[in-house]
Amino acid sequence: MNTPNKLTVLRLLLVPVFFVVAYFERSKEIYLFATIVYSIASATDFLDGYLARKYNLVTDFGKFMDPLADKVLVAAAMIFLVQVGRLPAFLVVVIVAREYAISILRAIASSQGTVIAAAKGGKIKTVTQMIGTILLLLNITVIGLPIMYIALIATIYSGGEYIYNSRHLISEK
């Protein structure tokens, strides 16, 4: 397994760490630690992609698992933010529904021997979601919440982009 794929696996492994820290202890220090864990996990997303492209280490595993790891990480943090009242539930429902709809689309593509790589709109969506989430974890809602609404728009747009670009897969089913 190459380094970018190891970073993707690390991101997945940090999700339960974030979950345990954030959900089972409520103090400013613990929230800060949870934010650090989330931030490290988010940073692995950028680092694994950079390394994969720079050193030509792009794999089908990475193309499939990297976006899945992002979805799991972001969903865990957003659900937590709803529970602590920092993020509206409807926003999370729309984002998570789109994330899993695209995961289903990727599974259909995979069953047909096709891997759908992340598109530019999907990358913008991920960046805005992660930055907004970090700000909300730090309770900087005045900036974090508007960024999450931008993330919502990017999420809907990129979902449409994936569906449009994969319409040949959908029409075959």
Give the role of each language-model region.
Residues 1-173:
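Alpha-helical transmembrane bundles and membrane-interface segments of multipass inner-membrane proteins
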